[in-house]
A protein has these predicted regions:
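Start-transfer (signal-anchor) and selected internal transmembrane alpha helices
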Residues: 1-20, 182-193
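Transmembrane-helix motifs of polytopic, lipid-linked glycan transferases
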Residues: 81-99, 133-138
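Membrane-interface helix-boundary motifs at transmembrane edges
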Residues: 92-103, 142-147, 179-190
């Protein structure tokens, strides 16, 4: 079963949410009200069809949809703070379920703090990181067996089509989790297989799902 964070960890995540909200509300109150996705989402009828027809387009479309509420006061800051907290919470749970000795939540806050210093125009990267972290938590929640490894393969493929490059980050999480388990050859094989499958997914997709006519290529 998926473990929970302790009370101190939950309180720290709450403080991180409040701090993120205040930071982005103070420094980027109007910046996120004028995004390309906001205009395209409203004016282009083919926007959804175009995005959903390419790898990672699903998360881009979700990000574009979320930006529709950014014209509402406090909406952009609250959305970004929530996504940062979700990513931090997912990473903290992954570290806990992976059986590492590190219970320090500060490590899980690092990706969010990086976004403070290097904010992006789109919130798609936040959705991507959050998805990868929680897929890793889901993977660790399954008992080590062929079911777990099969689920990892399916989830990697799902992450590629929905939110590439989330599959690469998720594959790294799988490799880290298997390495920390230290079960000998099996863990090594699973870790390598996850990384190889994540690397091959774009090549396989280009040969099967995203074949371009010669004229377009």
């Amino acid at each position: 079963a998926i473990q929970r964070l302790n009370l101190s960890g939950s309180f720290m995540l709450l403080l991180f949410f409040v701090g993120s909200f205040l930071f982005f509300e103070w420094h980027y109150r109007y910046f996120y009200r004028f995004l390309e996705q906001f205009v395209l989402f409203q004016t282009s009828e083919s926007y959804a069809h175009t995005l959903l027809g390419e790898p990672g387009g699903g998360v881009e479309y979700m990000a574009s949809g979320l930006t529709q509420c950014f014209s509402t006061p406090f909406a952009s800051s609250a959305t970004i703070a929530l996504l940062l907290t979700l990513a931090a919470g997912g990473l903290a749970l992954f570290l806990k379920t992976a059986g590492t000795a590190s219970g320090n939540l500060w490590i899980a806050l690092l990706p969010g703090l990086l976004f403070w210093f290097f904010p992006q125009e789109s919130i798609a990267p936040l959705l991507t990181v959050s998805l990868a972290c929680w897929l890793a938590v889901l993977y660790n929640a399954i008992k080590p067996s062929w079911v777990r490894y099969g689920a990892g393969l399916v989830l990697l493929t799902f992450a590629y089509f929905l939110a590439t490059p989330a599959h690469l980050l998720f594959a790294c999480f799988i490799a880290m989790s298997e390495a920390w388990r230290r079960e000998g050859t099996k863990s090594t094989v699973v870790a390598v297989a996850a990384l190889v499958w994540a690397a091959l997914l774009p090549l396989i997709a280009m040969r099967t799902c995203y074949i371009l006519p010669m004229r377009e290529a």
